[in-house]
Amino acid sequence: MAEKAVTIRTRKFMTNRLLSRKQFVIDVLHPGRANVSKAELKEKLARMYEVKDPNAIFVFKFRTHFGGGKSSGFGLIYDTVESAKKFEPKYRLIRNGLDTKIEKSRKQIKERKNRAKKIRGVKKTKAGDAKKK
């Protein structure tokens, strides 16, 4: 793939001490080129913000503007990978390779659903979890 110039701008930058991260909106200018990969963005952000571990960087919700050449999304840089594992949703951890997805069999899903059908109200969630172990 041809390495064309890519410009990364961050705006609405804020440090969130409560969640021990930096959060911002990313604007990527990539004229004459298809979308920039998230791995490449993480690598460039790690160099920009001098992050030791690129696994602590999360980029998501990218939308390409009409006509191409510009994309916008969100970025999070956690202080440590441990804090990222603590605060990030599981699906984002799986996408970034920090967690593994548990594949449930079709039969397990159906059995759990049928157990839950027999019970009403608040006890429904407990019934699904009890037999799961």
UniProtKB/Swiss-Prot annotation:
Give UniProt keywords alphabetically: Ribonucleoprotein, Ribosomal protein
Region described as Disordered: spans on this chain: 104-133
Biased composition, class Basic residues, residue ranges: 109-125
The record's PROSITE patterns line, in alphabetical order, gives: RIBOSOMAL_S24E
| Pfam families on file | Ribosomal_S24e (PF01282)
* GO CC annotation terms, alphabetical: chloroplast; cytosol; cytosolic ribosome; cytosolic small ribosomal subunit; nucleolus; plant-type vacuole
Top-rank lineage group of the source organism: Eukaryota
Q: Does the keyword Ribonucleoprotein apply?
A: yes
Q: Which GO terms describe its molecular function?
A: mRNA binding; structural constituent of ribosome
GO BP terms, alphabetized: translation
Q: Which InterPro entries does the record associate with it?
A: eRP_eS24_sf, Ribosomal_eS24, Ribosomal_eS24_CS, Ribosomal_uL23/eL15/eS24_sf
Give the family this protein belongs to, as stated in its UniProt record.
Belongs to the eukaryotic ribosomal protein eS24 family.
> Which HAMAP family is this protein grouped with?
Ribosomal_eS24
Protein name per its UniProtKB record: Small ribosomal subunit protein eS24z
The encoding gene = RPS24A
